[in-house]
Amino acid sequence: MKKGDIYYVDLSPAVGNELGGMRMCQIVEVYAEENLIRVIPMTRDPKTNSYVFREIHERTVSTKRLKEFIKNY
């Protein structure tokens, strides 16, 4: 896993207005020693039916939340 990779990430449980559930996320920082990553969740735009960053909502999560690798940008 490295910066720019896109994975499905399990963001549950969500609190308040956080995006939850299984989401495509892009990794923006890797903290290897702590087994943590900083990600930006993506969501589907109903107008274009494509994945977008609707709003920047960075989260730091455990690497154990990573599920399926999608691609690297």
Regions found by a protein language model. Name each.
Residues 1-12:
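Short coil-to-beta transition motif at edge beta-strands of beta-rich domains
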Residues 3, 17-22, 26-56:
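Compact nucleic-acid interaction/catalytic patches
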Residues 8, 39, 63-67:
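Generic N-terminal initiation segments characterized by hydrophobic and/or small/turn-forming residues
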Residues 13, 44, 63-65:
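Non-catalytic surface loops within mature trypsin-like serine protease
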Residues 53-73:
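C-terminal terminal-subdomain/extension
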